[in-house]
Amino acid sequence: DVREPDEFAAYRIEGAKLIPMRTIPARLHEIDRKTDVVMICRSGARSHHAGQFLKQNGFERVYNLAGGVIAWAQDVERAAA
């Protein structure tokens, strides 16, 4: 999750790890290159850019949650209805 701490505190997806976008370069060592990495943000824009950065730095299994947590929450609400 590349959102800011206040955004993450307000709404989070279970199992997500908070690494704010601005801190990714210094925290690359915390991300496992051998597993799938799903990038998450509010709308999908920041996570897209962060995912591109990871790919440029040798990560191969990088995916973006299209539409971000906004779209994810809407999908969950529709499924629950």
Show the residue positions of the predicted features:
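Rhodanese-like catalytic fold shared by cysteine-dependent sulfurtransferases
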Residues: 5-38, 45-81
